[in-house]
Amino acid sequence: MDFLEIKGNNTYLLRVKVKTNSIKQGILPYSDTDSWLSITLKSKPVKNKANKELINLIKKKINIASDQIHIISGMKKTSKTLEIKFNNNIGKSDLIKKLID
């Protein structure tokens, strides 16, 4: 699962590819060799709406606050890297389970 990388203590980098203006919002199935996690969003990529929808989707899935997740690259691209910080220890496999459930 190359789309999720441990950056440091309780900090992960999540690589996603977004498809905007979709009928459904969600995380698409993935394989262990995927470099990107594919996510569909309902919003159009206008006035940062899709980025906000992406942040809200991820933070609800893994139950974190808004200040614990940031887009660090790809603000205006479909390929994005997000930095996720946790207050407590969480394993990589636990994080993936939360994202997929």
Where do the protein language model's features map onto the residues?
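The alpha-helix within a helix-turn-helix
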Residues: 59
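Contiguous, often N-terminal, cationic amphipathic patches that form binding interfaces
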Residues: 1-52, 56, 70-76, 80-101
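Short acidic capping loops at alpha-helix termini that bridge into adjacent secondary structure
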Residues: 66-68
